Amino acid sequence: MKTGLPTPEQVAYVRKQLGTSENDIRVAILVIRKWLKMQPHLPQNIDDARLERMYINCKCSLERVKTSVDAYFSLKNRYPELLMNRNPREIIGVCKKFITMFPMPRLTDSCLRVSVTTNICENPDDYDPLVMSKAILLWSELMLREDYSLGDIMILDMKNVQAGHVLKTGIGLLRGLEMIYRGAYCRRIKALHFVNAPKVMDMIMTLVRAALPEKIRKRVMTHLPGSNTLFDHLPRSMVPNELGGTGGPAEELAEDHRERYWPLVDWFMEQDQFVSNESMRPHNMTCGMENGFSVDGSFKKLCID
């Protein structure tokens, strides 16, 4: 049950919802390419498929796409620990030892992409939030190549989460992750569902409030262990079996998704070459990451009174 590429019908639906067309997209890409050639600090190495998905994910705003293209190359300088030296075999090989993450293979009827995080390790010592964040951004890069959707619905299974997991997660890391996810990859979070909400949910929400913008905080929903409230928002076919759905076994879905990366290992590693040259940035132009995406880049740990 491999993650499916968008069907022609889904592509048409997404474009209709955004009020755009094949011709509009071609023109937009030409405009962006012309703009990109005028940016001495930015590489030219981004294909039309990624530009098209940026345009779609930015709701067809050319100015937002320009900001995102800048951030796509510039944020590698600011967050090399997240965006450089990304060997999928190494990152995924470590990540799968302590957590399972994957997208559901089909889009929802409204062309949203559901992603699932589950099976977090019981021992916080085995949990590595930096590796997990790198895996999330690998997925974001893959989606920029392949996906065609109107936004993301995230299911986060909190079973096994303890205070140690929360305290080990840095606020700065989450802020950087969110900024890259939204700014460079233009992903739009439509809902965050915390299922099997644990006793430390208050600590988790403290982290969420500290790290995420208010707009996203308002889209957070929690579901108690044993409840079916998740299915008030999603059909069971969009949820893996282990969480009460009928979408298939989580590990099988995850393994199918992992296989998507193996032919792209060299491509991911080659992307390290394509980074902004900040010494060439025009003096009257702010960095894309500072134009609406500025945050403290330090990876501070969460402090709870």
Where are these regions (language model features)?
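Basic, amphipathic alpha-helical/coil surface patches used to engage anionic, phosphate-bearing ligands
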Residues: 1-305
